[in-house]
A protein has these predicted regions:
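Catalytic-core regions of glycoside hydrolase
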Residues: 286, 296-387
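Feature activates predominantly on carbohydrate-active enzymes
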Residues: 97-323, 330
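Bacterial Sec-dependent N-terminal signal peptides
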Residues: 1-31
Length: 387
């Protein structure tokens, strides 16, 4: 009886040690492989892929899909017709759990399997495989047995690039797109200003501006890597790049300042729409047209209208134009809030809740008086450099 009891104790302790060993091994593996951005689900298994990383050379698709653009250690992978000779099997096979850009990646002892909902998901599946291969190679490890399911938590994942102050060589932007693609960024808002050779308004372009065709090629390159570039052309304010030119001075809100357009001058819109059309030609694959609109207050050359009224006149005209071009307009929303005396609480994190509430109680009617005039087809975006 005593011997049986001792055996049971040893068996229990042995099972506990084995379980802890498995947990420690999984934790160690997770520390060894850093996926950026992190994936939704990952499950490390016991064991490793049995072949050397350098021998991962061939891929087979039972659905006859093409390989996506490849990076790093996956660049040399070729597609073949014989599944027995392929280390990777991949397919675009929509499944119930898949959404746009989602994929699954499974590394077994003798096969790597990637499935996706669409070409973007396939692209991201191979990017994740490359990260695992590079981490393993850099640490002289074998590829882990692992099962990954990944989908985006945020559908549109853009960054903003501002080229108005300085334009790099074209090669820089191609290289940057490659870097962003590997981080699964899928959008760029490009603040272009005078760095585009406008055909309709050539005086606006700077001497180092790129032609529409050159930006279009960059946009095409980005799209092939699942990145859509949308232009940002400053509208009501930040307009010095347009209004500094002699022929455009009559469009100034203040004749002595090149900062802002007069929103009551019809020719303001003729010029702005020309700039938008050229920008859309240069970036034909984007869904959006960012029209700017921040940090500006106008008088309409002493019209008697309030700055908020004038802002809304301009905003409605340009958002309507953007929609007619099948673009979703994006607008910086700081000025309507500022003009309604509601901007302060947004950037002052030292205010108490009661202070914020009191400001909104007092000033919300300033905004509500015009609320029906705000366009409904517009993305209202807020910049914040104080976070």
């Amino acid at each position: 009886m005593l011997l049986q009891f001792r055996f049971s104790i040893v068996l229990i302790i042995g099972c506990q040690l084995f379980f802890l060993s498995c947990l420690n091994n999984q934790s160690k593996q997770e520390d060894q492989y850093i996926l950026i951005p992190s994936v939704l689900e990952k499950d490390f298994k016991e064991g490793h892929y049995k072949k050397e990383i350098k021998k991962i050379k061939y891929a087979y698709s039972p659905t006859n899909d093409s390989l996506p653009i490849l990076y790093g250690l996956t660049q040399h992978i070729e597609i073949i017709d014989n599944p027995k000779d392929a280390q990777i099997e991949f397919a675009i096979e929509p499944e119930e759990k898949f959404i746009e850009e989602s994929y699954s990646l499974q590394i077994n002892e003798d096969k790597i399997i990637i499935k996706s909902n669409d070409s973007a998901g396939l692209f991201y599946g191979f990017l994740t495989l490359n990260q695992l291969m590079e981490d393993a190679s850099n640490q002289n490890l074998q590829l882990p047995k692992i099962k990954i399911y990944d989908k985006p938590k945020i559908a549109f994942r853009p960054i903003q690039i501002d080229v108005k102050h300085h334009l790099e060589k074209k090669s820089y932007y191609y290289n940057l797109i490659d870097e962003l693609a590997q981080l699964k960024i899928n959008g760029i808002i490009l603040e272009i200003e005078d760095k585009l050779k406008y055909k309709r308004r050539p005086e606006v372009a700077s001497s180092d501006a790129l032609a529409i065709e050159e930006w279009r090629e960059i946009s095409k390159y980005a799209l092939a890597r699942n990145i859509e570039i949308s232009p940002l052309v400053q509208g009501l304010g930040h307009a010095s790049f347009v209004l500094k030119h002699k022929k455009n001075k009559p469009l100034r809100d203040d004749p002595n300042s090149d900062w802002a357009f007069n929103p009551l001058n019809p020719k303001t819109y003729e010029l702005q729409f020309d700039l938008y059309l050229d920008a859309i030609e240069a970036f034909p694959h984007g869904k959006y047209l960012h029209i700017g609109g921040d940090e500006v207050q106008t008088s309409g050359r002493g019209s008697g209208k309030s700055p908020l009224e004038l802002n809304l006149i301009w905003l409605n005209k340009v958002t309507s134009f953007a929609s007619k071009q099948n673009r979703i307009p994006i607008f910086w929303d700081d000025m309507p809030l500022k003009q309604a005396n509601l901007m302060g609480p947004i950037y002052n994190n030292k205010m108490s809740k009661s202070e914020v509430d009191s400001i909104w109680m007092a000033n919300e009617p300033n905004l509500n008086r015009f609320i029906e005039q705000f366009p409904k087809n517009c993305v209202y975006m807020r910049w914040n450099y104080h976070m």
